[in-house]
A protein has these predicted regions:
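Short phosphate-binding/catalytic loops that engage adenosine nucleotides
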Residues: 80, 154, 466
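N-terminal, positively charged nucleic-acid-binding surface of large information/translation enzymes
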Residues: 30-35, 39-125
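Short, small-residue-biased leader/transition segments that mark boundaries at the very start
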Residues: 1-5
Length: 467
């Protein structure tokens, strides 16, 4: 991890030491909020399950991008150095199906969707992962891992297929809070199944269809649940245990449960100390699904309302709660973001017209309040309240006839730091001499009640983003 940690700048180590600040997270494994204790002091290793790249990302896929990017930013604000890895599943039956339907190769499908996914990530102002492994580039390690499980008798081979023996590990079902007997009752029993147990899952699938590889058992491809275990091991330099494993609530079972089972079987570790899951996205109170015809692509929503507004909307609810998206929620997000950015813009303009440098000092107490909310299991609703409180104070300073620019700078810089932790884009307005002259002409026209000319100047100022 060293190279990433050396490269990465972080906001301020001040907060990690002052008053014993620490992060608290809801751990899905223990079902309670726990104090975060890193494996390596001052460092965070985090893996987030990425997409299966067969179709454009919808807004449900976009929510974890924002949630875990915000978690990373919060750790950085607390002084930690973070390595975040997020994969691409570029081997899957769905990818093969799309490739056949479109008459193109699987690689052409996956490259197109990976680009779209990264475009959406950047539009949401999310940092790129420190590593983004692909299944196709990890195949030798995947085959070696499956072979290890077979040799340890945690997996078995039937006619070229390889299955994981769930009964060989203890505590299966703990992450999803399910008992194995209950899972057995609900398991689908196929009379033609080659499995010893209905809960056993595929590690290697024998097939001649689509993209495939040679293996000791057959020509085929790996099962989904195996891929992430191997990529974690590879990307974190052979460490079988990382700090945080994240993903959507829908991945808890069976995907994450099966990852844990394999890791315990191979390495006697549970992959991660903290399991973090974000809630699902609903549309007008209904689950998003193709059958209901209410799937919204992330790129369409970004084009409609902008990446900043969508990010703000995602963060307006606690990350573990379901998020209901409708027109009312979108309008609220727009208004709230405008409520924050408008006084910032006014402050930049007034400071620029006065020739004042707002410097770097910020309202430490206000930022402390904000950070206290963020380190409490990413309590973004409380963090928003802290922002609105500072914005209220900023508005009061901006409206003064004789502006206290020291106070203005403290409030502006505090809000900027808060937005940076949330990943909300903000650019300071720097006025040129031409801008200042245009502003003076507008004020003069207003004073002389030449409203036609004033409207002309005002339109130009709005176009420049000054008003």
């Amino acid at each position: 991890l060293g190279d990433v940690y050396k490269r990465q700048a972080y906001v301020s180590a001040f907060f990690i030491s002052k008053g014993g600040r620490f992060m608290k997270l809801f751990n899905s494994m223990s079902q309670k909020i726990e104090e975060f204790k890193p494996i390596t002091e001052g460092q965070v290793s985090m893996y987030v399950c990425g997409p299966t790249v067969y179709n454009y990302p919808h807004i449900g896929n976009a929510r974890p991008i924002v949630v875990f990017d915000t978690l990373k930013r919060t750790f950085m604000a607390l002084g930690y150095k973070v390595k975040m890895v997020s994969n691409y599943t570029d081997v899957d039956d769905k990818i093969i199906k799309v490739a056949k339907e479109c008459g193109i190769s699987e690689k052409e499908v996956t490259e197109k969707i990976i680009k779209a996914y990264n475009d959406d990530r950047l539009a949401l102002h999310a940092m790129m992962p420190d590593a983004a492994p692909k299944v196709t580039e990890t195949m030798d390690a995947i085959i070696a891992f499956i072979d290890l499980l077979v040799k340890k008798e945690h997996a078995y081979v039937v006619d070229g297929d390889v299955y994981f023996r769930v009964s060989s590990v203890e505590n299966y079902g703990k992450l999803s809070n399910q008992q194995i007997d209950d899972l057995m009752v609900g398991a689908r029993i196929d009379e033609n199944s080659k499995k010893e147990n209905p809960l056993d899952f595929t590690l290697w699938k024998r097939t001649e269809e689509g993209i495939k590889w040679e293996s000791p058992w057959s020509v085929g491809r790996p099962g989904w649940h195996t891929e992430c275990v191997v990529m974690i091991n590879k990307e974190f330099d052979g460490n079988h245990l990382i700090d945080i494993h994240g993903g959507g609530m829908d991945l808890k079972f069976p995907h994450h449960e099966n990852e844990i089972a394999q890791s315990r079987a191979a390495y006697e570790t549970g992959i991660a100390n903290y399991w973090i899951h974000n809630g699902m996205v609903n549309i007008d109170g209904e689950k998003m699904s193709k059958s209901l015809g209410n799937v919204i692509w992330a790129k369409d929503m970004i084009e409609k309302i902008g990446g900043d507004t969508l990010r703000w909307l995602f963060l307006s609810s606690h990350y573990r709660s379901p998020l209901n998206i409708n027109e009312e929620a979108i309008e609220t997000a727009k208004k709230e973001l405008n409520k924050v950015k408008t006084p910032l813009k006014q402050a930049y303009v007034k400071a620029g017209l006065a020739g004042v440098d707002l410097k770097e000092e910020y309202d430490v107490e206000s930022f402390h309040t904000f950070l206290t909310a963020m380190e409490d299991d990413l309590n973004t609703p409380n963090a928003f309240a802290a922002i609105f409180d500072v914005v209220k104070q900023l508005n009061q300073v901006v409206r003064q006839k004789e502006i206290d620019f020291t106070a203005l700078g403290l409030k502006v810089n505090a809000v900027e730091k808060m937005l940076d932790v949330l990943g909300i884009e903000n650019h300071r307005i720097v006025l040129s001499e031409e801008d200042k002259n245009l502003h003076a002409e507008w004020k003069s026209a207003v004073a002389q009640k030449d409203f036609e000319l004033a409207d002309k100047f005002r339109a130009q100022l709005i176009e420049k983003g000054i008003l």
